[in-house]
A protein has these predicted regions:
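Inter-helical turn/loop segments and adjacent helix faces that build the functional surface
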Residues: 230-232
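Basic side chains
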Residues: 38, 98-101, 116, 172-175, ...
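N-terminal periplasmic/intermembrane-space "pro-region" immediately following the signal or transit peptide
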Residues: 2-81
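Outer-membrane beta-barrel pore domains
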Residues: 24, 83-84, 128, 141-145, ...
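Outer membrane beta-barrel
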Residues: 47-228, 237-242, 246-255, 321-322, ...
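General helical secondary-structure elements
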Residues: 34, 39-42, 94-97, 112, ...
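Short, positively charged
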Residues: 37-39, 186, 345
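Short glycine/proline-enriched turns and hinge-like loops at secondary-structure junctions
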Residues: 109-111, 234-238, 273, 309-311
Length: 400
C-alpha cells in the first residue's frame, strides 16, 4: 500500500518544476546559473523555513530508490555479471541520498565554492562499489562474505570553480567517481538496468584531487593525483595519475574522450591489492535527432601477480539508442570483454553479451527499464558451471 501511494504521488507530480521566484528574507549570492530540478523532497520544503534556508545557501537535497527483479537461467547467482547479480530475486539496489551545493559555472567572475555528498544507504550495489578503507568490513561481516545490503559513502568532495582561468577551471578534492567510460555508478545516469563487464571489472572511485580545465568551447583537459583506484585512506594506497582529453564541438554531432589511469601497475602482494593501469576511449555520434551511437574501447593490465606475473584485459562496447518519444527510448548494447588470464572475473576467456532494453518515464520522477540479455563465454563456465546465461529483468527508479 505504501509503495502504491508513493508511485501515485509521483505520477501525479509528473516532471519536477522549477521553483517559482519568491522574495527571500535575504537574497542568497551568488545565484546558480540555472535553477536545478526540484524533486519531491525539495518541492515539499518550498514555502517553509527549512526550504528557504537551503535555497539561501544553494543547497539541494535529493535522491532516488532503485529496485530490480531479474529472471534468470541461473539458479542462485549470476556472477560474474554484477550489480543485479541475484537470480530470480528482488534486489533493492540503491537508496541514494545526495546533498550538494553546486558551483556557479556562468555569470559571476569571482570563484565559487561548493560540495557534494552521495551515499548508498542501504543498497545491494554497495558490495561492488565500496572502496578499500571505507566501511569495507561489511564485505566480510557475513561469515567472511558480504552482507546482502550495506552502506557506501560512495562520493564526497569539496569543489571550487574559477571562471577566469582558461574558459573555466573546476577543482574537486575528496572521494570522487572515476572520470572515464560510458556507464555510471548512479542508476539514473544509465540507459540500461544491467551493466557491462567493462564497467563492472574496472575502477569506480578515486580519492585525491582532480582538476578540469576548459580550454575552448571544444577542448577540455582533466588531471588528478589520487591514492589509487577503489581505495580510500589505507596502507595499500599509492600515488596514481588520472587524466583525460575531451573534444566536443558545441554544435557538432561527434565527441571523443580519451582517459588514462596510470600508477605503478603492480599488484601489491603485501596488502593483496590491485593497482591496474587503464586506457579508455569513448566516441559518440548523433546520427539524427532520435538515434545516437556510442563506442567504448578499454584496455587494462597489472603486473607482479603471484601467479603468472602479468594479466591484461580489454573491452569493446557498442551502444545504439533510439528515442521513440520524450518519455520512451530503446537501447541495445553489444559487448566483447576478454578477461585473458581470468584476473578480473575469475574465469578466463572472452565474454560476449547482447542486451536490449527500454527506458520508460511516465513522469520524470519515475523510470521503468525492462531488458533482455544474453551472456556467453566459450572458454570457461562462469555461470554456475555453464558457458552461457540468459536473463530478463525490470527495474524502477523513483526519484525524490
Amino acid at each position: 500500500m505504501v509503495s502504491s501511494l508513493i508511485i501515485s504521488i509521483v505520477l501525479t507530480l509528473g516532471q519536477p518544476t522549477l521553483a517559482a521566484p519568491e522574495t527571500p528574507i535575504e537574497s542568497p549570492s551568488p545565484v546558480p546559473s540555472a535553477t536545478p530540478d526540484r524533486w519531491l523532497l525539495m518541492r515539499s520544503l518550498q514555502g517553509t523555513f527549512p526550504g528557504w534556508l537551503l535555497d539561501s545557501q544553494r543547497i539541494q537535497i535529493s535522491g532516488w530508490t532503485h529496485a530490480s527483479f531479474t529472471a534468470s537461467s541461473a539458479t542462485h547467482e549470476q556472477l560474474p555479471m554484477g550489480f543485479n547479480y541475484r537470480a530470480n530475486e528482488f534486489l533493492l539496489q540503491q537508496n541514494w541520498l545526495r546533498i550538494e551545493r553546486p558551483v556557479v559555472t556562468s555569470g559571476p567572475s569571482e570563484p565559487t565554492f561548493g560540495f557534494r555528498a552521495d551515499t548508498i544507504l542501504p543498497g545491494s550495489d554497495y558490495r561492488f562499489t565500496l572502496a578499500r578503507g571505507l566501511f569495507d568490513r561489511q564485505l566480510t561481516a557475513n561469515n567472511g562474505q558480504p552482507n546482502r545490503y550495506g552502506i557506501d559513502p560512495i562520493q564526497f568532495y569539496a569543489e571550487a570553480y574559477f571562471p577566469t582561468v582558461g574558459r573555466g577551471l573546476d577543482i574537486k578534492i575528496g572521494h570522487i567517481f572515476c572520470q572515464y567510460g560510458v556507464e555510471a555508478n548512479d542508476a539514473p545516469s544509465n540507459a540500461l538496468l544491467s551493466h557491462a563487464y567493462t564497467f563492472i571489472y574496472n575502477p569506480f572511485t578515486h580519492t585525491g584531487v582532480m582538476g578540469t580545465l576548459k580550454l575552448t568551447d571544444t577542448w577540455s583537459v582533466q588531471a588528478g593525483l589520487v591514492l589509487g583506484s577503489d581505495i580510500f585512506i589505507d596502507p595499500a594506497s599509492e600515488p596514481t595519475f588520472m587524466g583525460s582529453v575531451k573534444w566536443a564541438p558545441p554544435t557538432g554531432r561527434d565527441s571523443i574522450l580519451f582517459s588514462v589511469i596510470l600508477g605503478s601497475g603492480r599488484f601489491n602482494q603485501t596488502y593483496n591489492f590491485h593497482n591496474p593501469e587503464i586506457l579508455d576511449f569513448v566516441y559518440t555520434h548523433k546520427i539524427n535527432s532520435r538515434l545516437n551511437y556510442t563506442f567504448e574501447g578499454l584496455y587494462g593490465f597489472t603486473t607482479n601477480l603471484p601467479d603468472g606475473g602479468f594479466a591484461n584485459w580489454f573491452g569493446i562496447l557498442n551502444y545504439l539508442t533510439y528515442d521513440l518519444s520524450p518519455r520512451l527510448s530503446g537501447t541495445t548494447r553489444v559487448e566483447l570483454f576478454d578477461d585473458v588470464q581470468g584476473n578480473r572475473t575469475g574465469f578466463k576467456g572472452p565474454y560476449t553479451t547482447l542486451t536490449a532494453g527500454l527506458s520508460f518515464k511516465p513522469g520524470r520522477s519515475i523510470t521503468f527499464r525492462p531488458e533482455m540479455r544474453c551472456d556467453y563465454n566459450p572458454d570457461s563456465r562462469p555461470f554456475e558451471n555453464r558457458h552461457g546465461l540468459f536473463t530478463t529483468a525490470v527495474d524502477v527508479i523513483l526519484r525524490w
